[in-house]
Amino acid sequence: RAVQERVLPLLRYHYDNFIAQVPGEQQSGATPATYVMVAGYANGTPFIVDIDPHGLIGRYEEVGFHAIGSGSAMAQQAGTLLAHFQMTDRDVDHGVLAAVRVLDALRVTSPSIGGPVDVYRLNPEGAVALSEEDIDRVRERVRRWAELESEALDRLPSA
């Protein structure tokens, strides 16, 4: 709620003064676009929330994944496909692996969506931006993940 009270007026000002239309706001019954997504820790407990133009808050802790923006539907679908890996039971490093894997897959399948992205590693001590070198190291681990999946699939008997 504190995030909502601080962020909503700033974003409303931004839209009122710089952007002619808030997506979804003018249409009756339309779902408004999310203004902002926030992730962090409160009293040692992780949270993921988004806030829409009407101030409504969506919570995603149980899912452990959320996306907003032009490619969000595809990113959320990719996140769903990774759900069987039980990412909410894994550490932050595994979350970074999954995020980079999803972002790279979207870049291949939908090159017109989005642009450069920043990846942050978030834990109770704070948020740290990953450098290009860090992301390259993560991509090496993602390649190994894909190799292990392929090997496991090869060992399964065919129908």
Where are these regions (language model features)?
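Long, low-complexity N-terminal extensions
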Residues: R1-A159
